[in-house]
């Protein structure tokens, strides 16, 4: 579960390395799960890339440390909290996605992120 002030790693090559969640989008929501959109600020970034430090961006959650239960009865848990930066059209800002992503992204119409990911779990 991601909430305000949670730090996340960035799972793409947009230039940002770490994010801090400042708001979970949705009407009066407290926690974000896989596939949810958050507003975050960039805490660490590579120089001469697309995003700068302290820039406010939107991101979609692709991995969480909290256990994710599926309708089939399976549960899955990742080693880190990670997000991918997106633009206003819900397309990723980067051209590559690092690490596995959850299958629930396909159900939430983030097919571009799923196709860029090396592994879908």
UniProtKB/Swiss-Prot annotation:
The organism's superkingdom is given as Bacteria
Q: Which CDD domains match?
A: Ribosomal_uL14
**Pfam families assigned:** Ribosomal_L14
> Which keywords does UniProt give here?
Ribonucleoprotein, Ribosomal protein, RNA-binding, rRNA-binding
Listed InterPro entries = Ribosomal_uL14, Ribosomal_uL14_bac-type, Ribosomal_uL14_sf
SUPFAM superfamilies annotated for this entry?
Ribosomal protein L14
Asked if the keyword RNA-binding belongs to this entry, the reply reads: yes
Q: Name the Gene Ontology molecular function terms of this record.
A: large ribosomal subunit rRNA binding; structural constituent of ribosome
Q: Which GO terms describe its cellular component?
A: cytosolic large ribosomal subunit
GO BP terms in the entry? translation
Q: Which NCBIfam families match?
A: rplN_bact (TIGR01067)
Q: How does it assemble?
A: Part of the 50S ribosomal subunit. Forms a cluster with proteins L3 and L19. In the 70S ribosome, L14 and L19 interact and together make contacts with the 16S rRNA in bridges B5 and B8.
Q: What does the protein in this record do?
A: Binds to 23S rRNA. Forms part of two intersubunit bridges in the 70S ribosome.
Tell me the protein family, please.
Belongs to the universal ribosomal protein uL14 family.
Protein name, UniProt field? Large ribosomal subunit protein uL14
Q: Which species does this protein come from?
A: Prochlorococcus marinus (strain MIT 9301)
């Amino acid at each position: 579960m991601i909430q305000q002030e949670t730090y996340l790693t960035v799972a793409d090559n947009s230039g940002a390395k770490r994010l801090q969640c400042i708001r979970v989008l949705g009407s009066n929501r407290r926690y974000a799960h896989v596939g949810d959109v958050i507003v975050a600020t960039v805490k660490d970034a590579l120089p001469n890339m697309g995003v700068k430090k302290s820039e406010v961006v939107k991101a979609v959650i692709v991995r969480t440390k909290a256990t994710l239960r599926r309708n089939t009865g399976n549960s899955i848990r990742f080693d880190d909290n990670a997000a991918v930066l997106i633009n206003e059209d819900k397309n990723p800002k980067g051209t590559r996605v690092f690490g596995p992503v959850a299958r629930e992204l396909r159900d939430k119409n983030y097919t571009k992120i799923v196709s860029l990911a090396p592994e879908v779990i």
